[in-house]
Amino acid sequence: MNDKTVTINSNSNTDNKKNKTWQPVRNGKTFIKYLGLNKKISEKDKENLIEDSVNLIGQTINPENIENTVLNSTGLCFGQIQSGKTTSMEAISALAHDNKFKIIILLTGNVTPLASQNTSRVDRALQGREWHVIKNLPRVPWNKSENVNKLKNVINSSLSENKVIAETFNKTVLILSMKNPSKIRRITELFNEVSSWNNSIYDKVPTIIIDDEADHHSLNSQSSKNQADDKDEDELYRVEINETWETIAEKFEKSVRDLKEINPEIPEDQELNPGDLINTEHKDIRTHAAIRDLRTVFNFHSFLGYTATPNANLLTNTLNFLSPNFSQILEPGSDYTGLEFFFCQQKYIDRYISPIEEKIRELEDSNERPKSLEDAFMHFVVSVACGYITGHSNEGNRSMFIHPDRVLESHDQYIKWINAIKMKWEGELKTDKNTEEYKDIIDCIKKSLEGIRDNADEKDEIPEFSETFIQHFKESLTRIIPTKFNAGRGGRIPEIEWDRDYAHLLVGGQGLDRGFTVEGITVSYLSRSVGTRQQDTILQRARFFGYHKKQKNFIKIFLTDELSDFFRDTYHSDRELRMSLKRHSENPENNLKDWPRVWISRNIGNYKLTRPGINNMWGVVSRNLPPPPAREGFAWKMRSIDI
């Protein structure tokens, strides 16, 4: 067996207290109503959604057992790329309301399209008088006085000793917010104003904070810069006689927990000695700091971090307030097409994956249009024409995305190429039918259609080649207009109006990196290089994952050989990670902080698990790195073994 293992063992004596599990009410009115309105989910998938939601809520704080949890209730919700994590957030919110949670805060999307997409879905799904909705989003006016009143109403009724009042006016505040520092600080300021800075009033108000894409922006990417060994002596604090963790923390207005986190080289149970040099300044990113400030408002809350790529969350220092102590593996629906669907066997790779030229960078640099791009676009236009003929255009979308690079100039280059291909084909289709140009383009269209038919499971979905098909191809070609899906220079990433047109072609970089759903994705062209070779970052570019089985006959994914190998290998490592976490969580007494940090992969030496700044011990973990020198009392160990 060629698999490799990277193991990181935590030997630190962290506070491994875990909330006791409890049995939530699963047949409450709001949850039942939500499930009933969700017509797109099959009964079998609803059963899985119910079980996942109940198990997850049952690991959070128990609203009927009020206690001071501070920052000790942090969950990892591990789904798959485009597998319905937003649906889980909706279900969790509905279930939380029925179980007497009074405040739910959803942090989602650091770019406008993603924030708008996800919050609008949640807003539509959670309609009803049981909600006071506060929107903290771009292009949505912030009515401070109205929001203060909404929050006060819920707080006052929930704290009322009159049970009739509390039950009659049973509302939950649902805050839908973009995840950026200023927006998060605005929420914190709102709660501070309502409490007149006496946040103890929230001690009896059960709260859930949901973090969408929890591995992105939320974590402290400056963590590795908190090493005392990497600083000059004048940047550190020298411990004086009789000083302790507690007295120094009080002196610098920090918690003992925070002080120990930024001094990871000192074992947590070790006392300080006079003359020791320690960190007192915490380097972190603004979003991370804003989330910490928001969480400290609530002594009685749970934090749920959703992600499909949890390497960074699992590698962050277990003393950090975002290090999870429980987890829930979210099962995808039966129509999901992801790593397993496309990459578990060679026959599926052969069917759905097409190669991009090995020298794609050289072609781009010389402005030479790649043949694979023409093949991809031909497949897309033929698929769109099929949709118009069969009537699929009346009920959904057919889309294509091109992701060449984060650099804006590359997006311009590919749009010019697509427009040039369009112009060339339109011209050839207008020539006399006896010309070689016309015969060549017709032959290409026919071969593409026959290729789709040959691979299709349902042949009747594929129309016959005919003059009618040629006319639909011409019209489809005209209607497809490529969209530059980036913010330009100082602008915004455009919001796509999926209902306005059937066919969409997006060319972008960052906007297509994570979270964003490309409706009706049919053809994907991912030519971007692996860059810094971070496994989680590359996996997030798989916008072709999702619920696409209904149009599997038309799906085609164009990848470089390197990316194709990456996704094939990642299928195995992702499966191993899920199985390991699932086994660990089967025992309700197990704390996720104690889970052995083990990653198994066939090709783990070629990729980094996550970005360097997250792991403040040795940074990025890779089999290619030499073992670090042994240090007495050090909190972490790393080794690489063959199995």
Kindly give the residue locations of the regions a language model identified.
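Primarily a LysM-type cell-wall glycan-binding module
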Residues: 231-255, 276, 281
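C-terminal helicase lobe and adjacent C-terminal extensions/tails of nucleic-acid helicase motors
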Residues: 353-442, 446-459, 545-548, 561-643
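Conserved RecA-like ASCE ATPase "motif II neighborhood" in helicase/translocase motors
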Residues: 146-210, 218-231, 282-294, 508-509
